[in-house]
Amino acid sequence: MNASESLNAANECHDDDPVRGAALLRGIDAAALKADDWPLYAFLLNHVLIEKLGLPAEANERQHRLLAVAGETPAPVLLRHAAVSALLAGDSVAELAHAAEFGAATSVSTAQAVELVQLAAAALRVPGLGATAAGRLALDALAPLAAAHWQQTSALDTAAAAQCNNIAGSLAERPLADLADATLREAVERTADWSQVFWQRAGTWVNHERACYLRALVAGALGEAEAARAHARTGLALLDSHDSAQEQSVDRAFLELEQAYACERLGRAEEAAAAHARADALAADFNDAGLTAWYRQRVERNRLLKG
């Protein structure tokens, strides 16, 4: 395989087999990649080597090599990934240098860039921590978002939305016992809220609809059925308004599923059955093994949450 093929192979297998994904990444010479491949390569270095395997020093070394290949003006996304790996590797000098460059490249202060880097680093660390520690880390990373400079549109909004989305999704999928932890519960709700705030500023209607799905999923995980139903219905209303071509039928299936689950918990049996039937009909047309497996996982997860 050439470098791009190895990268694609790593991207396909890393969740199911992170060791193989890491081996593929290690075999890639960054100089042999096309510039268009660099963002995915940088993302996978941190996601696989740090989040999956706990190897921040190696990720940091490889991020530095990538920046050397990228030249004098690396894309902001490369600087962000490099700053995150430096932070988690304990390389404070490189962290601050990359964060300063990242801030300059995105027209924000170094302080705000550092806050985004810390949020992204938290997203990598949260999955490996216990419930209370994960919740506390997430809340600490969210705290700077209350500052005035985060209340206006900036070039960091999309990245902040994505990082909050990642943290909320990870926390919502924790073992059921973890969902009883007060710190984690506060963290998952607040990260989902912040994700929606940023997507409303920076995203398209599809991002807005998916933020509603995340809010529904989180509310369901927390046992807040009324809120879950309301968020799911808001997302479905956005689809009704914008998706006449039915290009987002996968999104609709998962929103209907969350609506069905919420209605079951609320005792709305007929409404639940109708929503579940619509979800199942849409899922039957996925023609994608991964999506079908994900749908079945959500069905089982909702069954467990319902108790």
Predicted regions and their residues:
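Amphipathic alpha-helical repeat scaffolds of TPR domains
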Residues: 4-7, 36-47, 74-81, 110-129, ...
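C-terminal non-catalytic interaction modules
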Residues: 9, 259-307
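Residue at a conserved register position within TPR or TPR-like alpha-solenoid repeats
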Residues: 13, 49-50, 86-87, 123, ...
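Residues in the short coil linking paired helices within alpha-helical repeat scaffolds
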Residues: 17, 54-55, 91-92, 127-134, ...
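Amphipathic alpha-helical segments of tetratricopeptide repeats
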Residues: 26-30, 64-71, 100-108, 139-152, ...
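Structural signature of alpha-solenoid helical repeat junctions
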Residues: 37-38, 74-78, 111-113, 152-163, ...
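Structural motif corresponding to the intra-repeat A-B loop/turn of tetratricopeptide repeats
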Residues: 52-53, 89-90, 174, 182, ...
